[in-house]
């Protein structure tokens, strides 16, 4: 009986540890230029799972990352200008974010965590950002098209 209890405790501990080890870190760079043009988050679309983190890394100055749309129950974020930020995404859904100084250039991105439970509100946020952008109008829409319903 004592040996069985030890095995049970060990199995539970291993399951918990492996669950934490499976969480991934995704890196998004904030750049003046990249594969998708000027003033970009790279990559602009990230597919993640609940518990994953996204690390926004400042490559060039004068950028930040601010959430615009997050799923119900999720916490938004806002980094200061010239600072990166790491965000843990625990809630399933679509997260839309932007760079405040370069929103007019449609410097924005999309993260899908698990199921797209807030697809419609995320689409509305993308449409609003795109309508307000002076340039790169297809960029954010292209990222959002990668969201799987």
Region spans (language model):
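Extracytoplasmic copper-binding redox domains, predominantly the cupredoxin/blue-copper superfamily
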Residues: 23-149
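Bacterial N-terminal signal peptides that target proteins for export
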Residues: 1-9
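Cleavable N-terminal signal peptides
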Residues: 10-11, 21-22
